[in-house]
Amino acid sequence: LELGETAGAAGIGLLDAPVSGGPIVAQQGGLAIMVGGDPALFDEARPDFEAKGSPFRHVGPLGAGLTIKLVNNMIAISAAPVVLEALRIGLAQGMDLSTMVDVIRASSGNTWLTQEWDQSKMFLQFALRDPSQLEGFVATGLKDMELVASTCAAAGIDAPLLHHSIRALEELGVEGFRSNLATVLEALQSD
């Protein structure tokens, strides 16, 4: 917001426009773009957003794009390890992976990870083959969650589940993710 004030004082318009979707979605041109800032400037920049991804949406004043991005990441980062652990539990109980994913997709437990299962499988396989990808996911996830926590602290917002998710992600760590991934991917190969 300080940058917006500085830019505005110099007669320069500024939008914040974070994206969501990950590398596979980016390659397909399907990144979601959340744009904060002056609506007139958003309309002026619309052709640039159309060229970059879809969907894109004006979400409010400067800073609103980042807020929605962080809220979205909190949900996705908190849900991903739960989904993988739940699938691992189902596999340990003899359930078929494809059957579980199909039922979850049509049920209240559906998340992006299960809804976009083909893309998720590609990412999961890539992350297991390349440890730096998994390490990057965990590190970036923790960074984003800490940003949400600091935003909440500054605004006086109580967020106990956020703090629980951060602790759980720290405790699970890369090795915990890797273990859950390996179990799920082993089931994929026999699927």
Located regions from the model:
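Rossmann-fold dinucleotide-binding core
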Residues: L1-N73
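Histidine (H) residue identity feature
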Residues: H58, H163-H164
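Helical "substrate-binding/catalytic lid" subdomain
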Residues: G65-D158, H164, A168-Q189
